[in-house]
Every structure is written in structure tokens, then in C-alpha cells.
């Protein structure tokens, strides 16, 4: 199966297509990190796209025991080789269940995000590289105490489901754009729709031509309405429905001790 509706004809346009089917689900992001480090260190101009495992449910077994910093957590061993979906047997969606889920989720983030970047930043030559990192959707971790089984993609999503990280990391020797110039204006005012125009501008395409067809890159004021589409129109042909994100109503977790946040 190919991600994001990619077909075989499009796959043929990729010079090197890598999958880690024989690697344990838990270790696939680390395999991706190792491959990214290899490519960063080969001193060749390349466009690299990585679909990470990340912290998609089920999150019971997506981290090693050494990264079980948050406890108590979901029972281990049932989903060791399940990448992106799973049965909910034994999970009733009540307050106590979500306490366990949030701890397992945070442990997974420590491993598949924290350790991933720790390795890339330590071993990869980023001096002439530019990395854009994001996630495909946010999560309803039921921090309001609301019962339920879904973390995302329901018919009536909470606003947290539309919140994702959007990070640009540029190497010290690479001269592209002044990313800080629009940071204040664009922080919490940008979306996935700004990523593709940004890539085109990095490739040298004319800004006016990009904006007229694809919209604004992150190098200019994006003016994004800060909404997210919660209908799967791209996949199912439905008309998109947009929900505004009010940052004043977002629930955020409490600050963890530094030792816990570092996975120690």
C-alpha cells in the first residue's frame, strides 16, 4: 500500500523508494532516521519525503521499555506489529482509560519524535539542509474528561484535532529566506496548505506565479484563517467542512519535569 493515494505511475518518478516492512513497527522511525542521516551526509542535492510511524494509535507498543517515562500506561504486548489501527478490546474510553492512553502517547512521542530528532541532529550533516516537520492531524486526548473512543477523525471533532506542529529547521551554511521575518505574524496562523508553495519557492519558482496558483508560502504573511477540514473530501468525494481553531479554548498538558520530558 502507498501513502496518501500515491499510485504506481507516480511511484516510478521517485529515484529511490524505501520501505521498512521487515523492521519492527517500534523501530521503523529509527530506521527512517538512519536513512535520513545517510542521505544528509552524502553531500548530494535531494528532495526527501518521509512518512513516519509517529504516534498513531494503537500506542501501546510503539516505544521501548527504556522510554516508559510516563506511568501508569496501557498494557503492553498486544499491538507490537500494528502500525496504524487496532481493536479497542479492553479500552472503554472512560476517564481512567484515557489517563493510561495519554501516558502511552507521551512515551511514544518521546521515542518516535524526541529520539528521532536526537539522532538526526546528532549524526546528520544539516549544514546545507532544510527540514520541514509536521503531522497529518492532531489528537483528541480527552483531557477535558470527555468519554469516547476516538482520538481523531470523528464527525464532530474537538479543536485540538486540527492542531499540528509546523517546524522549519535550516542549516547554518544554507542561505534561503529569512524565516524569522514572518515568524511572529505566521505563528499559529499557518497550515499544511502553505508547505507546498514553500517547497516551490525553495526550488526557485517565481513567488507571484506560485501564489496565483498554489497560495502563499511561509516566507510571506500567510493570512491563514486557522481552520481545518474535518471531512475526507480528498478520499471520499465529500464537500469539505471547515472548523476554526480558537487557541483560547485549547487544552494543553501540564509541564512535565525536565528529567521525564527527556525520557530519563
Named regions from a protein language model:
Residues 47-54, 106-109, 130-135, 168:
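Short beta-strand segments
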Residues 54-57, 137-141:
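Feature marks short, surface-exposed loop/turn motifs that line or immediately flank catalytic pockets
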Residues 34-37, 75-131:
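A long, amphipathic alpha-helix that forms part
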Residues 157-163:
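Short Pro/Gly-enriched coil loops immediately N-terminal to beta-strands
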Residues 1-92, 163, 191-192, 197-205, ...:
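Active-site-proximal alpha/beta segments of enzymes that process anionic O-linked groups
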Residues 23-30, 99, 103-110, 186-193:
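Soluble non-cytosolic domains of exported or imported proteins
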Residues 38, 118-128, 139-141, 145, ...:
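Membrane-interface soluble catalytic domains
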